[in-house]
Amino acid sequence: MEYTYQYSWIIPFIPLPVPILIGMGLLLFPTATKNHRRVWSFPSILLLSMVMLLSVYLSIQQINRSFIYQYVWSWTINNDFSLEFGHLIDPLASIMLILITTVGILVLFYSDNYMSHDQGYLRFFAYLSFFNTSMLGLVTSSNLIQIYIFWELVGMCSYLLIGFWFTRPIAATACQKAFVTNRVGDFGLLLGILGLYWITGSFEFRDLFEIVNNLIDNNNQVHFLFVTLCSFLLFAGAVAKSAQFPLHVWLPDAMEGPTPISALIHAATMVAAGIFLVARLLPLFVITPYIMNLISLIGIITVLLGATLALAQKDIKRSLAYSTMSQLGYMMLALGMGSYRAALFHLITHAYSKALLFLGSGSIIHSMESIVGYSPDKSQNMVLMGGLKKHVPITKTAFLVGTLSLCGIPPLACFWSKDEILNDSWLYSPIFAIIACSTAGFTAFYMFRVYLLTFDGHLNVHFQNYSGQKSSSVYSISLWGKQVPKRIQNPFCLLNLLTMNNNESTSFFWNNKCKLDGNVKKRIRPFITVTHFPNRKTFSYPHESDNTMLFSLFVLVLFTLFVAAIGIPFNQEGSDCDILSKLLNPSINLLHQNSNNFTDWYEFVTNASFSVSIALLGIFIATFLYKPIYSSLQNFNLLNSFYKRSANRVMWDKIQNWIYDWSYNRGYIDSFYTISLTGGIRGLAELSHFFDRRVIDGILNGFGLTSFFLGESLKYFGGGRISSYLLLYSIFIFIFLLMDSFFTNLPFFVLCQFLDSSFSMSISGFLLYENF
């Protein structure tokens, strides 16, 4: 076992040969490499599978022995400073290694078919393998310097993958937005690392925690304030990377990348890096209570904000992105409360559930592209979907499992972890608990809204004119159910919500239905440049994905069904013996310090019943608003009579419109940043440009013009006669000597002698000039 741990440093570098060999192949043998590009998926999956097997072995050793291994190499720069590099294998690293490798393998397997027709297939697999390498290096780092290096590599890979289709302006803008937003957090992270090194003299985690703890125990107020500041800066890095408020604005725009990378970013890599950093540094944060309170506060704000922003999104991937933001808020809330186990448990269950949902959405998008073309604005638009359960039944089943899991319906994965966080929140703060439980209902609502809009009812794409012709340029399809002008300020009615997926015979609220022209599909050009389609087929309806994509969905369904078993407390002899508790024992748990590690199943069932009831309420409301069953009620005019007699109709419409505007416009946070930050920086740049051009350049050009005009003026004093120059020279010398004699008392005869010689030189020069 010692031998295995000693050489576990190679784990991050096992997937690295893939991008290196792809790059060398494109440089040395470009034609052969491109012609056999599908071959490169095999080594990518094989090498990552080797890492997964090694990670599973290390985790088994961790469970059996609770063993922590750290190996360090010291690089001495001088007598006063040295850098130490190494690797750390502990329970947290083992969990993250398995999570990254399992999700990464399934994403690679899925991507082989999903990206098969894209010209950037090789580039995608090179980026993806390097992404996995960076994340593996991050979770096995033994000090803050290594974490920062791999942290930046993860950010670079996300920039490359979000902007993978960089020829699309919106994708190029999205990757720049993600890069700039994360630079804010990364700058704070770097300052925090340097500050802690200045006060402790070490980057190693163990030394860092021990020294800081000793400094705080000495009741040194200066050290406490400085450690609090450094902890805040470190937390800022996690806020940006995990898309927490207020640095969350990059996450929905990151959906412009290919769907497989969206699944990897939102499940196991980039957003998980911030949660991992807080979990790794939790012993430091526990020493500073203000930071723990801040972590929980940011977490609960993000929980509520992400859920409300997901209520009215029309893009299926953006809806899932805001869902990820909200669930990451739950994890951050748990860490802020000190519930270390619950946070990691939810990180695991959410990773597989969200990977299932994203890969399922990729299968939906893949099926819609055969109808609407390769345009994300159309293939990802839930307004154009509906009724897909008849065309993609396997994808529908997988997506339903992921949806129910995220809603917190037992016995699926997220139910167990989210319920544990909700129970701990009641012990921490009743206000936070109320918000967290309410958000659980919002989660169930917007997730079933996505499911019903996508799979229920009838395929709306056949009833709407989406071709971009003049007849549809003024109107767009609203998620609330009818065609309205694109201006968000226009009012929406509640009845429009109820007819979202109704067919034409029963829904009399859609009065203007434009049939799809037969030549529309021929006029739609691919949005993304592709190579060729060997067996191109034309489909009039969506079709199920290929078996390679469905295999990844099937495996993720199994994970979603059974992965929670590692954290379910099976009671034996008065103590819980679940795998996760054994792996994390001893772990930080501030809310259960005096617990005997015994599960009260009566209390558990009571709390679980409450959380499940909230989730079922959210599902019921979503079904009430989006299920086509209400077309029968419309035929009896029941809804119309109720709606007309309602005295609060105007007020309800205003509330509904406000919620819609808030959600669809992303809480106006992006607009605020655009006006205040972007506008302010542009104004400052214009002011700086004006100052540089008018003031700085004006001064320099003024000196030049002054010299020019002075020279032009002086040139008229010279007539070209040497005697005149000598006479003028003598006069200036006389004036100088006269002034000098006045101040230094120079003898008068010396001055006269100099004037006589100067006058003789002038006469001689004049005569010489006349002779010539």
Swiss-Prot record:
It comes from Oenothera argillicola. The chain crosses the membrane at residues 9-29, 40-60, 89-109, 125-145, 147-167, 185-205, 220-240, 259-279, 290-312, 328-348, 355-375, 397-417, 426-446, 550-570, 604-624, 731-751. It comes from the Eukaryota. It is found in: Plastid, Chloroplast thylakoid membrane. Its EC number is 7.1.1.-. It catalyses: a plastoquinone + NADH + (n+1) H(+)(in) = a plastoquinol + NAD(+) + n H(+)(out); a plastoquinone + NADPH + (n+1) H(+)(in) = a plastoquinol + NADP(+) + n H(+)(out). This is NAD(P)H-quinone oxidoreductase subunit 5, chloroplastic. InterPro entries: NADH_UbQ_OxRdtase_chlpt_su5_C (IPR002128), NADHpl_OxRdtase_5_subgr (IPR018393), ND/Mrp_TM (IPR001750), NU5C-like (IPR003945), Proton_antipo_N (IPR001516). The lineage of its organism: Eukaryota, Viridiplantae, Streptophyta, Embryophyta, Tracheophyta. It is a multi-pass membrane protein. The keyword Membrane applies. One of its GO terms (biological process) is ATP synthesis coupled electron transport. The gene is ndhF. NDH shuttles electrons from NAD(P)H:plastoquinone, via FMN and iron-sulfur (Fe-S) centers, to quinones in the photosynthetic chain and possibly in a chloroplast respiratory chain. The immediate electron acceptor for the enzyme in this species is believed to be plastoquinone. Couples the redox reaction to proton translocation, and thus conserves the redox energy in a proton gradient. Its main location: plastid. Pfam families: Proton_antipo_C, Proton_antipo_M, Proton_antipo_N. GO terms for molecular function: NADH dehydrogenase (ubiquinone) activity; quinone binding. Belongs to the complex I subunit 5 family. GO terms for cellular component: chloroplast thylakoid membrane. Keywords: Chloroplast, Membrane, NAD, NADP, Plastid, Plastoquinone, Quinone, Thylakoid, Translocase, Transmembrane, Transmembrane helix, Transport. NDH is composed of at least 16 different subunits, 5 of which are encoded in the nucleus.
